[in-house]
Amino acid sequence: MTVYPDSLKKLIDQFSKLPGIGKKTAERLSIFILNSKKEVVADFSHSLNNLKKSIESCDVCNCLIENESCHICNDPYRSDELLCVVKDPTDIFLIEKSSFKGKYHVLGGLISPLDGIDAENLNFESFFKRLDQVKEVILAIDPSQEGDMTMLYLSDQLKKYSIKISRLARGIPVGSSLEFIDQVTLTHSLNDRVEIK
């Protein structure tokens, strides 16, 4: 068993708390920081400290913002008629890579009765206030029990509006082999198949 000085051990413990970081990776990261120049460590520390001070949620869409200005809500080139609903702000980063040009609404979670999370615990109230100009709502929510429950709730609530409701297609990833696809994904892919024209 390796005996680390207390300060290094504390840093390893902190890195180990991060998702996807095991003990070995935490050790490597900590030793890398220990061996880095003081300026690099100071910049890293400053970035961490500044993160919690400067990042907030947009009052309209609940996206992550800095300096009280939401670059998505304020972008005049984005369509107000297309609203993509996501679970977390980090989902937006993924969808942005697809060059989506609508706006977003972050729910802040999914309906999960087993965890005591119902519609009142999520950002639905602010969502329904935004629907005046919206013509289509895209539900970009995880295909899980909680995700399906949340989509069912939303689609039921949206019936009173003249809004098109869609969800992300569920299917087989490009470049994958059928033998490695799970049964649920394969079933959804067959049910949601599209005609080749």
Segments the model singles out, each with a brief description of its role:
Residues Q14, L18, S36, L51, ...:
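Conserved, well-folded catalytic cores of nucleic-acid-processing
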Residues P19, K38, L51, C63, ...:
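Conserved phosphate/pyrophosphate-binding and hydrolysis machinery centered on Walker-type P-loop NTPases
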Residues K101, F128-K197:
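Long C-terminal interaction/binding lobes of large macromolecular proteins
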Residues L8-K17, E27-S36, L152-L168, V184:
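S-adenosyl-L-methionine-dependent methyltransferase catalytic core, i.e., the SAM/SAH-binding region
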Residues A26, D75-S144:
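Extended interfacial segments that mediate partner engagement and assembly in macromolecular machines
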Residues T2-L8, K17, S30-C84, D88-I92:
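Cys/His-rich Zn2+-binding cysteine-cluster or related metal-binding knuckle/ribbon modules and their
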Residues V40, S45-L48, D59, H71-D75, ...:
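Core recognition of P-loop NTPase motor domains used across DNA-transaction enzymes
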